[in-house]
């Protein structure tokens, strides 16, 4: 199946957008399904870094480990799920607009199902993400444009 892709323009510089979206501790602030995030290891986020992300889907919570595959500030990042029945694959790209005063953020999300995840991905996960992702991007835009981002 094709990745789910959403794009939004944000009135902040690519560096500001990149800094916020690639800090996994911010996920629960702008992603509706993200309950908590825990870094696995103490080092700064880099290629190879891992984080445990707990998400709520309906009334259930699931934790999966995501690993940073690519991290090219301030333009691109790629993280991939390495365990659990549903493994997300997230790629983000930031394009500068208006001489770098604004940014165009494109998020692309795909999934691999393992075991029960093979049934969950098409029946539950994809429909949920198709609804949530545009809302998440609007929330992110609001946080960044209000200056509330840490």
Task: Name each model feature, range by range.
Residues 7-11, 38, 67, 93, ...:
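Generic structural detector for well-ordered beta-strands
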Residues 78-135, 142:
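Beta-strand/loop substructures that line and gate deep hydrophobic ligand-binding cavities in soluble
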Residues 49-56, 77-83:
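Short beta-strand segments that buttress and anchor functional surface loops
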């Amino acid at each position: 199946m094709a990745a789910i892709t959403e794009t939004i323009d944000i009135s902040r510089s690519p560096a500001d957008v990149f800094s916020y979206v690639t800090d996994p501790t911010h996920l629960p602030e702008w992603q509706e399904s993200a309950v908590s995030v825990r870094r696995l290891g103490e080092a700064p986020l880099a290629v190879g870094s891992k984080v445990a992300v707990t998400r709520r889907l309906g009334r259930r919570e699931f934790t999966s480990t995501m690993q940073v595959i690519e991290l090219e500030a301030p333009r691109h990042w790629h993280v991939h799920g390495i365990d659990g029945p549903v493994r997300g694959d997230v790629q983000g790209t930031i394009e500068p607009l208006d001489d770098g005063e604004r940014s165009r953020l494109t998020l692309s999300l795909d999934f691999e199902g393992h075991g029960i995840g093979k049934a969950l991905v098409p029946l539950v996960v994809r429909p949920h993400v198709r609804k949530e992702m545009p809302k998440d991007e609007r929330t992110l835009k609001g946080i960044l444009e209000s200056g509330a981002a840490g």
